[in-house]
């Protein structure tokens, strides 16, 4: 069974996240096309301090199970500032598959909960609805899988974080982005340049993702109308041509000379 993506990668970073000034940022993007297909993109980036304090981190990251589950993996690769980044993508053929994939990103403690994307209406006039909530439960426990918690009796390094007086929000950042087709009817996120974004609170505060957009495909509507119009004109042209031919033949028959006896 595939371990949750954020849990999977974050487990490799957990040992060094607790060190002062280290940081890991995750961006999850749901991109939906007008026809309902699209892509989910997950980008996880560790800063330079993590790489310096854990030089073997790059080799420790394992993604074989993610690849087996259909995710495309790029990296981990070096960033310009000396950090590491890994990118995971997965295409989907419709909202139902997208909902399933969103469920693979994090565990039951967060940060993504009850994520659902639906589509209603017609191809040329459809409404997309995004539901769910962002919430991190239990601090670092949100980034450890059940097997690890059962083995250790709790999230690893919690005592170190508490002893160091570190704020989880200073060490971990998660942003969820939604790129949905059409005009935004309502959303709880920040919308800019066609992207709706939410920042995941690290203090356990729940954030609703309630969003609705309506997509009216004007080009397709015009195309369909034009097709009907052209067919109608063609039909009229055929009828007019038949009538004209009939009138010409009738006129010729009237002008035909009477044979002499």
Map each language-model feature to its residues.
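Bacterial N-terminal signal peptides that target proteins for export
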Residues: 1-10
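C-terminal motif of bacterial Sec signal peptides marking the signal peptidase cleavage site
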Residues: 18-21
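Bacterial signal peptide processing site
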Residues: 23-25
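Post-signal peptide N-terminal segment of mature Sec-exported envelope proteins
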Residues: 31-48
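Structured domain cores in non-transmembrane regions
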Residues: 48-132
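Intrinsically disordered, low-complexity linkers and stems that provide flexible hinges
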Residues: 123-229
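C-terminal single-pass membrane-anchor helix
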Residues: 219-261
